[in-house]
Amino acid sequence: EENTNALMTSCADALHFSMMSGDVKITNSLIEYSHDDALNIKHGYFYKVADADTSSYTFTFTRITTSMPLPNEGDKIAIYEESTFNSHGTYTVVSAKEENGKMLVKVKERIRNFNTWEASRVTFLSNTPNFVFSNNIVRNKRNRGILVQVPNAVIENNTFMNVGHGSIQAATAMDKFN
């Protein structure tokens, strides 16, 4: 703004995180004047369910996010219907391998009613960050405030002022919002 010390960055997001795991906490911060998002954190769009063999407890997935690793034994995955976000369950991985561009993932739990499922997506729960965004001020933004694309995020006690295109967009890897 003219005659002030306020400057807008020429880059897009002030904070942009991708493919993180562990604890990611942003607290007691002032974020302002970024060109696009004050914060964008993403991780979880993992695979699309291509098929399932319910007798062998094996899913066939195709990749959506190319850089996501295969799950290991004991990892947790969750499956959600694309159009409704309804859960098709959380599964524990027994084994996973890649064959001909597809992922074959054997799970511990029984796959129920697969023949009734609509198009569904998989979230790799064991490889997503524990995200906390609290006690922050996001202001003077011409675009979106924060874009959160990870499951189980905690967003609390923040102030959004002069944000042009919405304060919070939550697209959290198909989980539901409380």
What annotation goes with each model-predicted range?
Residues 2-13, 22, 35-41, 142-149, ...:
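Short glycine/acidic-rich loop motifs that flank beta-strands on beta-rich extracellular proteins
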Residues 20-25, 129-132, 150-155:
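Short "repeat-start/strand-capping" segments in structured domains, especially the N-termini
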Residues 58-66:
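Short alpha-helix capping/helix-loop boundary micro-motifs
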Residues 66-102:
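Ser/Thr/Gly-rich low-complexity blocks that favor extended beta-strand/coil architectures
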Residues 87-132, 139, 147:
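Small/polar beta-strand repeat architecture
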Residues 121-122, 143-144, 173-178:
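Short, contiguous acidic/charged loop-to-helix segments that flank catalytic cores in large enzymes
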